[in-house]
UniProtKB/Swiss-Prot annotation:
This is Dof zinc finger protein DOF4.3. GO terms for biological process: regulation of DNA-templated transcription. The keyword Ribosomal protein does not apply. It comes from Arabidopsis thaliana (Mouse-ear cress). It comes from the Eukaryota. A zinc finger (Dof-type) spans 25-79. Pfam families: Zn_ribbon_Dof. One of its GO terms (molecular function) is sequence-specific DNA binding. GO terms for cellular component: nucleus. Its main location: nucleus. PROSITE patterns: ZF_DOF_1 (PS01361), ZF_DOF_2 (PS50884).
Length: 232
């Protein structure tokens, strides 16, 4: 058994040993000795393949020579054309100055100014239903800054009474100016009133207020407590 293993090991060692390379040969085409061994063609020791460094061509020893031009085995170098990459094309197409934000500082100021003017005109139109805005804290409503926010239920005195105005998020895209005078106006976009109806409503309201004021003043003058007592 031991002898069998020794024989097997010797056979494996013999099989693992690679055959020595063949001796250098002269090029079969140009007769140059500047050659090198490459490999065995089809794993056969009888077909060693060589490469000639002089004419840059391969040949197999003992095989037929093909009609290969000088340097035909090497690939010709292709000239590269410097083409811009996709990233460069995108960067050139999109310049830093061409991209503008939706609102820059100047446009934002212009927008706020125009929006403030529209909101002020709307508040002035609502205020005209009751009286001139000069009686309402010296025109405070007309000078509303578009980005200023008031607390809800901000009371403004009006003659002998008062009315409430609620401002929510003045200066945002959705202006909510709620007027609590017998009802709420949720949005100035929903406030539509004919000029003729508004004028008639103002006249009737002013007449009613004047009548109430005259009656109150007349009854106060005619009250017995206001009569001066005469006599000795």
């Amino acid at each position: 058994m031991d002898n069998f293993n020794v024989v097997a090991n010797e056979d494996n060692q013999v099989n693992d040993v690679k055959p020595p390379p063949p001796p250098p040969r002269v090029c079969a085409r140009c007769d140059s000795d500047n050659t090198k061994f490459c490999y065995y063609n089809n794993y056969s020791e009888f077909q060693p393949r060589y490469f000639c460094k002089n004419c840059r061509r391969y040949w197999t020893h003992g095989g037929a020579l093909r009609n290969v031009p000088i340097g035909g085995s090497s690939r010709a170098k292709r000239t590269r054309i410097n083409q811009p990459s996709v990233a460069q094309m995108v960067s050139v197409g999109i310049q830093p100055g061409s991209h503008k934000p939706f609102f820059n500082v100047q446009e934002n100021n212009d927008f706020v100014g125009s929006f403030g003017a529209s909101s002020s005109s709307f508040v002035a139109a609502v205020g005209n239903r009751f009286s001139s805005l000069s009686h309402i804290h010296g025109g405070m409503v007309t000078n509303v800054h578009p980005t200023q926010t008031f607390r809800p239920n901000h009371r403004l005195a009006f003659h002998n009474g008062s009315f409430e105005q609620d401002y929510y998020d003045v200066g945002s895209d959705n202006l909510l100016v709620n007027q609590q005078v017998g009802g709420y106006v949720d949005n100035h976009n929903g406030y539509h009133m004919n000029q003729v109806d508004q004028y008639n409503w103002n006249q009737s309201f002013n007449n009613a207020m004047n009548m109430n004021y005259n009656n109150a003043s007349t009854s106060g003058r005619m009250h017995p407590s206001h009569l001066e007592k005469g006599g000795p």
